[in-house]
């Protein structure tokens, strides 16, 4: 069993500010960093640091070679990562004094994934393997359809949400991982926890995890025995940068599922990993290793 992440890789330009810039305003920044990022890259790093056997597929520009190096350094298999002509995907991130972030995303190389690359990559995977997806790459509906035909277990984190996701067949997914806003967007509901009822009625075989910020998270897992519902509290942390919180949670959660861990244990480990990540600046660089997560949990 392997995990394939067909995901984005970005260069993150991170600006520390007192508050988010307003329309028509020019704002001085306190500092600037250039860091590796992208939801796909972050989740692959989180999966690897959680102890998973993960492969990353996608595209990088000529200026993105250091992103491949970072994945390799973290034990991620990059055999399915392609270098293309053109600009690397990147983000412009404002981080305010409360640790909250505001992000502009330029797709670049992440929007250059071809059907030929998809076919070639998926040919190496099959039943029992996991596929992790986010909404920062092109051809997402095609990837889902082809992976489903190969019997893969598909996890989608539909972020950032846009209308293109309406072309994705959610009935072919094993898990949908969303925050409060995305839960409402995917279901059309006004309340995050009501979203489960709507999604379950449409896609009876779909399991859903909803992260609820400071209120923790809740998972609805559809199994052969019925429905398993688990709620997990959020661990307290002195946040300085929340950029990688969701991606860290996703990586540790999926890594736990792939290992066959109980659902409540997967959520507990993911919640602690996420709490640790927000105490550090940056995205991929803030993600803890499983040994640190387990040590912190043992202290509780």
Residue ranges and their predicted role:
Residues 1-23:
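Positively charged, low-complexity intrinsically disordered leader regions
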Residues 2-3, 23-90, 291, 295-300:
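Substrate-binding N-lobe of the ribokinase-like
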Residues 3, 163, 192-300:
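Conserved phosphate-binding/catalytic region of the ribokinase-like
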Residues 12, 184, 284:
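Nucleotide phosphate-binding site architecture
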Residues 20-29, 177-179, 230-233:
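Short glycine/proline- and charge-enriched loop/turn segments
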């Amino acid at each position: 069993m392997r995990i394939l992440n067909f995901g984005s890789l970005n260069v993150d330009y991170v600006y520390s500010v007192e508050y988010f810039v307003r329309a028509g305003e020019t704002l001085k920044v306190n500092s600037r960093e250039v860091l590796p990022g992208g939801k796909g890259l972050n989740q692959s790093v989180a999966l690897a640091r959680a102890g998973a056997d993960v492969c990353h597929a996608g595209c990088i520009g000529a200026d993105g070679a250091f992103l491949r190096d970072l994945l390799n350094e973290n034990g991620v298999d990059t055999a399915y990562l392609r270098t293309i002509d053109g600009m690397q995907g990147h983000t412009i991130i404002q981080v305010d004094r409360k640790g909250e972030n505001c992000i502009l995303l330029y797709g670049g190389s992440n929007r250059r994934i071809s059907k030929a690359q998809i076919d070639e990559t998926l040919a190496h995977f099959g039943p029992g393997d996991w596929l992790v997806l986010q909404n920062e790459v092109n051809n997402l509906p095609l990837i889902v359809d082809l992976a489903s035909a190969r019997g893969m277990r598909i996890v989608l984190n539909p972020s950032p949400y846009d209308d293109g996701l309406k072309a994705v067949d959610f009935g072919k997914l094993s898990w949908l991982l969303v925050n409060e806003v995305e839960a409402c967007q995917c279901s059309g509901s006004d309340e995050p926890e009501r979203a489960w009822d709507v999604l379950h009625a449409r896609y009876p075989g779909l399991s859903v995890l909803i992260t609820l910020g400071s209120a923790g998270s809740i998972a609805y897992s559809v199994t052969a025995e019925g429905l398993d519902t688990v709620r997990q509290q959020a661990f307290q942390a002195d946040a300085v940068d929340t950029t990688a919180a969701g991606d860290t949670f996703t990586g540790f959660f999926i890594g736990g599922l792939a290992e066959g861990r109980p659902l409540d244990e997967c959520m507990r480990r993911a919640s602690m990993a996420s709490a640790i990540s927000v105490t550090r600046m940056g995205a991929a660089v803030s993600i803890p290793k499983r040994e640190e997560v387990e040590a912190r949990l043992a202290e509780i």
